[in-house]
Amino acid sequence: MVQAYSYRIENTDDCYWVYLNEILLGTLDKGTKDTWHVNIELSGDNLLFTKLGFLKSSIYIQDLNSGESIGCISVPILPIFFQKFKFIYKGGEKMVWVGRNFFSFHWLWRRNKKTVLETVEDIVQGDKSGVITLSSYLNESNLLILTGIYLSLRRKRKLSLGLYNLSRRLAGKEWLQKDI
């Protein structure tokens, strides 16, 4: 049975709050250099995404609560042209994140060529909201949603040469400077 949820993303300078049916699902917060802190509020998981490598890079996901490795995402050499990221989840389970259009407004997760999660952003409203459909709500669904949003945001920033959300990021810095 397919389940549908609405989602919304709010952000300030490199910090994103992801709401699922208006309930805070989690946060994505840019750390130092090539790290992101991902907190899944619903389950209390605290994760660290670390990008290592230059040409053949990978994103390693570590659970900060237990210290164990959750998985690894292989980044294509030319991610601008190739819209698939392979995710090897703990236990050797393989999944693929697929961007369905150039800027990744529509993306999905596949396991064994079956779609387990699909997201479509409503670009008409322009408020970073949309619909997420799940084939079934699994234990790792929250992780897949936040990881997918992370990959989508990463791709949008790379493809727009850093201009994606630039006005919002600059407005946030001006607001901080006015208070000082």
Regions found by a protein language model. Name each.
Residues 9, 52-55, 79-80:
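Short, solvent-exposed loop/turn segments at conserved positions within beta-propeller repeat blades
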Residues 38-69:
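Short, well-structured hydrophobic secondary-structure segments
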Residues 1-35, 44-45, 68, 81-86, ...:
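Low-complexity or membrane-interfacial segments used for flexible interactions
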Residues 75-76, 148:
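Acidic (Asp/Glu) and glycine-rich low-complexity loops/linkers
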Residues 51, 74, 97-99:
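Beta-strand C-termini and the immediately following turn/loop, strongest in propeller blades
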Residues 61-62, 77-79, 87:
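Short, conserved, surface-exposed binding loops centered on an aromatic residue
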